[in-house]
A protein has these predicted regions:
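Glycine/serine-rich anion-binding loops at beta->alpha junctions
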Residues: 86-102, 137-143
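Short acidic, glycine/proline-enriched helix-loop-strand junctions
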Residues: 9, 55, 104-113
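Short Gly/Thr/Asp-enriched flexible loops that form oxyanion-binding sites at enzyme active sites
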Residues: 76-78, 97-110, 145-146
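Active-site segments that bind and position negatively charged phosphate/pyrophosphate groups
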Residues: 201-241
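ATP/NTP phosphate-donor binding region
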Residues: 1-88
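A glycine/threonine-rich phosphate-anchoring loop and its flanking beta-alpha core
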Residues: 109-209, 213
Length: 241
């Protein structure tokens, strides 16, 4: 008899100031993976670093992850981690830094691993050196709770969807303050991304009694709140989050 699996992080930390959870972690070193400048501009990168330092950790920053992260970026990030030897990998930002951090993690724990094996969904075992925390800055990708990563082969202009329960984050931190900084256009775009994911989940051949209620509720929330979130973003920051 065929069976299904439903993989999500062991912990989902949510609410205002949820970044404070980072101060409770145990370990010696943490690598923060982030994208452009928004997380630094709004102070969340420095706040995450401060919370990790409160936990007694040395912190490495791996920034500049581009939209649609490349194989090259992931390998370079994995090499930097190999030099630093983090106990925790913290992805902070949108889908791109979260997707990149997942594959950097592979190259950190398994240097030289064949990328095409990942494309074939043959992932090596992880968590022998580090665990992964994802902290999203938008509401659209859901990479913080999924087994997916999308990485681009820039030489051949191919985007590869990678899937494995190995890369489901150990912890997702949903701090309301972070996505509340999204401008209206990004709020609209990522809100429709949520709708697309939810509809796909509901009509998927892999849908089941565990996933259907989540998909339907997500669709309902988008219909109820997305217009308000876009048009009244200053007054309804919580809704946008």
């Amino acid at each position: 008899m065929a069976y299904s699996t439903f993989s999500i992080p062991k912990q989902v930390i949510h609410g205002n100031n949820a970044l404070e959870f980072l101060s409770t972690l145990e370990g010696k070193r943490a690598s923060i993976v982030t994208g452009g400048h928004s997380m630094k501009r709004f102070g969340f990168l420095d706040e995450a670093k401060t919370q990790l330092e409160k936990a007694g950790m040395e912190v490495q920053i791996i920034d500049g992850v581009e939209p649609d992260p490349s194989i090259t970026t992931c390998k370079a990030g994995g090499a930097k981690m190999a030099e630093f030897q983090p106990d925790w990998i913290i992805a902070l930002g949108g889908g791109s830094p979260m997707d990149a951090a997942k594959v950097m993690w592979v190259y950190y724990e398994h240097p030289g691993y064949d990328f095409m094996e990942l494309v074939r969904f043959n992932f090596p075992p992880l968590r022998t050196k580090a665990k992964l925390i994802c902290i999203p800055s938008t509401s659209g990708t859901a990479s913080e709770i999924t087994a997916f990563s999308v990485i681009t082969d820039t030489d051949n202009h191919i985007k590869y969807p990678l899937v494995s329960p190995q890369i489901v984050p150990d912890v997702a931190i949903l701090d309301d303050r972070i996505p509340a900084k999204m401008p209206p256009l990004i709020t609209a775009q990522t809100g429709m991304d949520v709708m697309t994911h939810a509809i796909e989940a509901y009509v998927s051949t892999a849908a089941d009694d565990y996933t259907d209620p989540l998909a339907l509720h997500a669709i309902q929330l988008v219909f109820e709140y997305l217009e308000t979130a876009v048009n009244k973003c200053d007054a309804d920051a919580f809704i946008r989050a």
